[in-house]
């Protein structure tokens, strides 16, 4: 009898989640494409005096080749290291001075960067994203690549090699996908 009550309670709890499944969250937005092909999605919310800029590139570790992995994640790091009009070290410094929180991440299918900052600093975030998108090569050097390669290696040691079960995130994809599938290797490289 006790098992029956527990089972009934579980089904009741699971079923109660479906009662709200019909509700949809509607977020109004405007979507347009710039002449250079960049898709822009804008959602306005004036309830707080902050703005978020989120730039997504349709490239991730899934775009890499067998035996040549980790480049998407490496470039995620390199794109913080200055560009044609932004000296090395100034990207984060300028954003922090404006009261921003920023970061980037890489997955199998995308690399993204975001800035969350006061509304009056929107132009700064757009300038920085535009400059790193258009003028990265002006500031590239073998030293920057080597420096960030070392940072990524250290990140791998901290988050995978020296963590309980950390290696599982490297082993799991190898066992879920065929060796030639772009999801069979870890994002970090």
Show the residue positions of the predicted features.
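Bacterial N-terminal signal peptides that target proteins for export
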Residues: 1-8
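Hydrophobic helical h-region of N-terminal Sec-dependent signal peptides
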Residues: 9-13, 17
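His/Glu-rich zincin catalytic helix
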Residues: 6, 18-92, 114-117, 123-130, ...
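A ubiquitous, low-specificity "background" feature that marks scattered single residues
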Residues: 11-12, 51, 79, 135, ...
């Amino acid at each position: 009898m006790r098992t029956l009550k527990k089972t009934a309670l579980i089904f009741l709890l699971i079923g109660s989640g479906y009662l709200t499944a019909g509700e949809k969250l509607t977020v109004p937005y405007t979507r347009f494409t710039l002449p250079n092909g960049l898709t822009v999605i804008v959602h306005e919310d004036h309830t707080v005096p902050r703005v978020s800029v989120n730039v997504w590139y349709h490239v991730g570790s899934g775009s890499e080749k067998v035996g040549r992995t980790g480049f998407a994640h490496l470039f995620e790091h390199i794109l913080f290291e200055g560009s044609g009009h932004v000296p090395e070290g100034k990207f984060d410094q300028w954003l922090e001075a404006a009261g921003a929180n920023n970061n980037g991440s890489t997955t199998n299918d995308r690399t993204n960067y975001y800035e969350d900052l006061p509304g009056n600093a929107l132009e700064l975030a757009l300038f920085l994203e535009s400059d790193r998108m258009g003028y990265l090569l002006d500031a590239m050097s073998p030293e920057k690549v080597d420096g960030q390669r070392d940072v990524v290696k250290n990140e791998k040691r901290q988050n995978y090699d020296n963590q309980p079960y950390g290696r599982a995130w490297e082993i799991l994809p190898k066992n879920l996908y065929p060796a030639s599938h772009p999801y069979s290797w870890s994002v970090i490289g």
